[in-house]
Amino acid sequence: MIKERVPISGDLQSKVKQLMEYAGWQEGRKVDISIAEKYYADHGVPMMKTTQRFYRKYFGLCCEWYLAQKKLKWAADFEFALFPYLVNGIKNHLEDAYFRDMSGCELAEIEQAAGQKCQPIGHIGYYYPAEVWISEYGKLYAKYEYQDEIECF
């Protein structure tokens, strides 16, 4: 977990890039995803190619940090938690229930909205992070527990 509150500036794209770099991301990043591939296979869900590409870029980044809003003294906790969740190398046992839920009837709802095959990848966001799926064409679909709409990125 990154506990320091760091000021970020610029437009939204610039801010997101700064946050991702602070969490360990860099241009051209490619990491070993064998732990994640095994996790998916153990749950009977072989990773799609787009899921593999996404994970090679983003798996293993710091999954919890604070996002400074208007004042550095107050900051929202931000999650970038991809399955399997590893916080300081320790597995979060709630993830199996989340993965199961996101692979069942919720997945059917996402695939219907997307019109293509999708896979769950985890939770991303702050306060109430969204459940996030990736489509076979690389689009991200997010659903929050407090709204009915499915968002596409």
Predicted regions, residues:
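A surface-exposed partner-binding patch
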Residues: 1-128
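Short active-site-adjacent structural elements
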Residues: 129-132, 151
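Short acidic-glycine loop/turn motifs at beta-strand connectors
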Residues: 134-137
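Short hydrophobic/aromatic-rich beta-strand segments that constitute the beta-sheet cores
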Residues: 140-143
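Compact, glycine/acidic-enriched structural inserts
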Residues: 145-153
